[in-house]
């Protein structure tokens, strides 16, 4: 399974992308 830091970084990227729309 992915590490917690990887999941957190991916989630942050998704939130930033959505917020930028």
Swiss-Prot record:
Superkingdom classification of source: Eukaryota
KW Transmembrane (keyword) present: no
Keyword NAD applies: no
Keywords from the named record: Allergen
Protein name from the UniProt record: Pollen allergen Ole e 7
